């Protein structure tokens, strides 16, 4: 585990590390929770950052922008409205950024919520949570890769790699597991359970980002698991009306009582054992700005691993800010060509959804 003292020492040095350099970031799903905590840490550690924040309503987020601005008067904070579960909206937002910016140092994505066991679909036909946890993230990444690569090219060759542009997806990296899996399962109602959904979106993020890391070596790709954090995600899950949905009145009442008991018992315990939100923001900023190749080399010198060691360029990160080095679980998927298959599936979904929206056949 990377100590909090080391995290804070690194973050405190970001002002000097980025002196004379612009830092431009786009945050998706960061109007609260981990993403917002990371923004708060970033704007206090870098003098004049430019931060784009995607939100559902710029008017409703205006007060939060004002609060953030008070933390750093020199920060440029831009709220961008968008319904990110819709790929067409993702394209619109990306086009705004591409027109305004000549560089992008960090694409930070953390949208989503816990599955409630009942799929719901966007007007574009995608399962909503699958879109938030996977499809929209990959669409942002694909659209903004030219900007990320341009940033990499403008950096001087002798600059430290902690200034390499970075794609950062907060979900469940490092917790991939062996399971009967095909990419198409993401859209299957038959496989829509909480555990299956988490397992599938976790694996798809890892496979697709690893594929991109091989294709785009000038950009770092991170799939991170934040662990248990003191956000409202568990409370929202337990309080969701979907948790008590049933045709039978008695069963609906029993489920409602169970949720009340869980809220009374589980939530206090969760907040005791979970990581403070401020610390999570500190750790996520560290992971988004540290020299990951150097950390990879450092961890490689630690006691030997039993499995196959992951290669640098694509990093799965633990909530402790350590890189997941054991790559054994992914070997079977690679042998089956799953990274390429996941990528092909993703591109096919993009074409299908966006061609339908534009009226193409």
From Swiss-Prot:
SUPFAM superfamilies: NAD(P)-binding Rossmann-fold domains. It is an enzyme of class 1 (oxidoreductase). Its EC number is 1.-.-.-. It comes from Aspergillus flavus (strain ATCC 200026 / FGSC A1120 / IAM 13836 / NRRL 3357 / JCM 12722 / SRRC 167). Keywords: Membrane, Oxidoreductase, Transmembrane, Transmembrane helix. Disruption phenotype: Results in a significant reduction in leporin C and absence of detectable amounts of leporin B. The keyword Transmembrane applies. Belongs to the NmrA-type oxidoreductase family. This is Oxidoreductase lepF. The lineage of its organism: Eukaryota, Fungi, Dikarya, Ascomycota, Pezizomycotina. It is a single-pass membrane protein. It is found in: Membrane. GO terms for molecular function: oxidoreductase activity. Oxidoreductase; part of the gene cluster 23 that mediates the biosynthesis of a family of 2-pyridones known as leporins. The hybrid PKS-NRPS synthetase lepA and the enoyl reductase lepG are responsible for fusion of phenylalanine with a hexaketide and subsequent release of the stable tetramic acid precursor, pre-leporin C. Because lepA lacks a designated enoylreductase (ER) domain, the required activity is provided the enoyl reductase lepG. It is possible that the dehydrogenase lepF also participates in production of pre-leporin C. One of its GO terms (cellular component) is membrane.
